[in-house]
A protein has these predicted regions:
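Charge-patterned, long linear interaction tracts outside catalytic cores
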Residues: 127-167, 171
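Cofactor- and metal-binding active-site motifs of prokaryotic enzymes
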Residues: 20-134, 145-146
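Long alpha-helical, hydrophobic tracts
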Residues: 16-29, 151-153, 157-160, 171, ...
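Single conserved hydrophobic/aromatic residue that forms the stacking wall/gate
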Residues: 1-2, 168-179
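Hydrophobic, Leu/Ile/Phe/Ala-enriched alpha-helical segments that form helix-helix packing faces
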Residues: 3-10, 96, 127, 158
Length: 179
């Protein structure tokens, strides 16, 4: 119910994966489905009592940026009107950190369909930037001695983003001509 409300509320293009992730096999089916639909960024929606471990592994296995958000409890019966999606979001963020996985988590990741639609709109430029940078190819000029930290440290962050780096050593021309 909640996913459909989010899709209806969000103004942009949004593919709704029909697979509900309850275990690792479901996670694999969901990834197969979104890859088949040629999605290059994901919003992983944590409902109440969701299995955070398989949902967290999506970030590990998907080749693109992922954002994690969670359902707000609406009945007001829980403490401060908050239900189990908030707890699941905490478990998810802990799981991501333990596994050294990168994912985007909004400042307030638990919300209603309207809130989450806004979070998705805010995520789109982040996802575009991550996709653009990770597809970037940089050609640097050297030589850069491998043990000279000051030369190599600035590119570590680029490697972590998946940027392809090629180093061209500039030395003597192999064949020089004078005309």
């Amino acid at each position: 119910m909640y996913k459909r409300q989010i899709k209806e509320t969000y103004k942009g293009e949004l593919y709704e994966c029909p697979v509900t992730v309850e275990n690792e096999k479901d996670m694999e089916k969901a990834l197969e489905d979104v890859n088949k639909a040629e999605c290059n960024a994901l919003v992983v929606f944590l409902g109440n009592f969701g299995p955070e471990t398989p949902e967290t592994l999506i970030a590990e296995r998907f080749d693109g940026p992922c954002m994690y958000v969670a359902a707000a409890e609406g009945d007001g019966d829980m403490i401060n009107g908050r239900g189990d999606a908030y707890c699941g979001m905490l478990n998810c963020s802990y799981n991501l950190k333990m596994r050294h996985l990168k994912a985007y988590i909004p400042e307030y990741p638990v919300g209603t369909a309207d809130d989450i639609a806004k979070m998705i709109a805010d995520f789109v430029p982040v996802a575009r930037a991550v996709i653009g940078v990770s597809n970037l190819k940089i050609i640097t000029f050297g030589p850069r001695p491998q043990d000279f930290f000051a030369c190599n440290a600035p590119i570590k962050g680029l490697y972590e983003l998946g940027v392809e780096l090629s180093l061209i050593h500039i030395s003597e021309p192999t064949r020089l001509a004078l005309i």
